[in-house]
Amino acid sequence: MAIRRRRRTFHRRKVCRFCVDSELKIDYKDSKTLRYFVTERGKIVPRRISGNCAKHQRELTLAVKRARQIALLPHTTIHNV
């Protein structure tokens, strides 16, 4: 019986873009930047996928919620009835 060996794939660790570039700021009024961190279904992308650090993920979550509150970002996608 042949033994199958799995090759380990190397996954590059994602780096927080807000820590790397101090010019970038998280602002609830900047919906263009916030859309990158929201799925097409309207959910906030988790840290392990987006690569943000804990501090900036908390700020980002707060900014997305504020943008939703004043209708800069939708809560969900458009539903076809």
Curated annotation (Swiss-Prot):
InterPro entries: Ribosomal_bS18, Ribosomal_bS18_CS, Ribosomal_bS18_sf
Disulfide bonds: none
UniProt GO MF annotations: small ribosomal subunit rRNA binding; structural constituent of ribosome
Pfam families according to UniProt: Ribosomal_S18
A Gene Ontology cellular-component term: cytosolic small ribosomal subunit
Domain of life: Bacteria
NCBIfam families, per database record: S18
Subunit structure of this chain's protein: Part of the 30S ribosomal subunit. Forms a tight heterodimer with protein bS6.
Family recorded in the similarity comment: Belongs to the bacterial ribosomal protein bS18 family.
Record function comment: Binds as a heterodimer with protein bS6 to the central domain of the 16S rRNA, where it helps stabilize the platform of the 30S subunit.
Protein name: Small ribosomal subunit protein bS18
